Amino acid sequence: MEKERETLQVWKQRVGQELDSVIAFWMEHSHDQEHGGFFTCLGRDGQVYDHLKYVWLQGRQVWMYCRLYRTFERFRRVELLDAAKAGGEFLLSYARVAPPGKKCAFVLTQDGRPVKVQRTIFSECFYTMAMNELWKVTGEMHYQREAVEMMDQIIHWVREDPAGLGRPQLSGTLATEPMAVPMMLLNLVEQLGEEDEEMTDKYAELGDWCAHRILQHVQRDGQVVLENVSEDGKELPGCLGRHQNPGHTLEAGWFLLQYALRKGDPKLQRHIIDKFLLLPFHSGWDPEHGGLFYFQDADDLCPTQLEWNMKLWWPHTEAMIAFLMGYRDSGDPALLNLFYQVAEYTFHQFRDPEYGEWFGYLNQEGKVALTIKGGPFKGCFHVPRCLAMCEQILGALLQRLGPAPLGSLPAVPTREGSK
């Protein structure tokens, strides 16, 4: 037990120090003091290389800052909250393409003019997360009204009428359900329902619906999890049907673990661990170089995506959360060992001890392919969310072990030593 305690304590200190470093990077380099919001196109040293603003990443950074402010005493800093509020007001003013319509842009200029719209729900989802978390830290009801109105619009698009998304219904297009849609909705159900009984009750049926739809992606008698299935939960033909995304499956896994914990369903929990944690890890982990492949083909054919064998930052952060949460909920030591395996690889390969933050894109061998720290898809989200959640779970695990004997805790490593 003492060896376990020592290892957990070392990792708690390690992720906590890394979280401090990562947030310091974004606070120093990403804030737009003129217009509000955040620059995410940042080079290795934090230099801004493009001033476009991506609505997904604006919402994510507002959410991240607010979540840290609300749940970590050391992040209860006025400059963090002020930046989050400025980002939230930027979103309120500019994210929607044609107010009072709810459709949000994907890309905005620095001063908020729309550049591009995606015909999906994801800009709106991250907008909702940002507004709800802003309400939780400020108590200002206009943020919560905005969150609930947007949530209800998203539900309408997904479950009743998608016409407002602007996607043409072409005769040759397969009716497809990507796992990302029920995943994101389940995440929003968790977000809005946290410590809010009214919202929990309002969206309970939606949470059940989302979980059921995600579980339909387990196919071939439980041997694979597919990224896309038909609307009635069957495997689709061709590359689209065989497409697998191990990192996405692992992320869905910890979303589902939260759902199973809320439901008090240990049988579902075990199924999730087997199919959404262990299955994608064992098929997706590169046995030669380590790390998770980005994409795979369920029949072991060559994937068509050029980046299929690259190692990206976010599948590894999601794996860290999933395995640590799985261990917390099940007590299975194999899951804790997998957390350590993924975390060691991730910290060694992605961290940049010289300039801070993490590289996002490695080649198959684990060498840095892109030196940027942020871009159209990488912002202040997956890395700090992972570090914050892991620090909290590790703290809970240490509490579960009880107080340490006097003199048994390891010394806290210095920031230099942790590099």
Swiss-Prot record:
A GO molecular-function annotation: N-acylglucosamine 2-epimerase activity
Tissues showing expression: Kidney, adrenal gland, brain, lung, spleen, ovary, testis and heart.
EC number, UniProt record: 5.1.3.8
EC top class, as a word: isomerase
Pathway(s) of this molecule: Amino-sugar metabolism; N-acetylneuraminate degradation
Positions of region (Leucine-zipper): 185-206
GO BP field: carbohydrate metabolic process; N-acetylglucosamine metabolic process; N-acetylmannosamine metabolic process; N-acetylneuraminate catabolic process
Annotated family: Belongs to the N-acylglucosamine 2-epimerase family.
Assembly and binders: Homodimer. Forms a heterodimer with renin and inhibits its activity.
Function noted in UniProt: Catalyzes the interconversion of N-acetylglucosamine to N-acetylmannosamine. Involved in the N-glycolylneuraminic acid (Neu5Gc) degradation pathway.
Protein name: N-acylglucosamine 2-epimerase
